[in-house]
Amino acid sequence: GTSQTVDWDLSEMNSQTINLKVNTDHNVGIRFINSSDPNDIEDITLEVIAEADEHQVFYEFADVSVNVTSASNDTKDGGRGVLLNSVWNASSIGTGLVRVYLIHEPTNFNATTRDGLGGNNDVAIDIPVSIVG
């Protein structure tokens, strides 16, 4: 398959578009990098893995329908996938956004909405999504 890397830059508040093919499984990995100090770039993903019981990645889609499941290589906490590695499958063609959250200390890991998860946003970013046939 093909691979795509999409960067989101806080200083520019924009991102490249994530391109998906409809009705196809896409293996998605996410990393959180703090590059606010170019002399001390920090991979926050390592902290999320070490503190998996205190974190959850959540994907909220607008104007597109995408099913997200935990990948077999995802970081797990008691069987629950943190969603650092996930599988996405879009059910229809279209364009929209995915809002990516890194949630600190969620209160309900089984919730299906951002509000239902509780906790605080460590990260909340919007990335354009394009789904083609």
Predicted regions and their residues:
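First exposed extracellular module after export/assembly in secreted or surface-exposed proteins
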Residues: 1-133
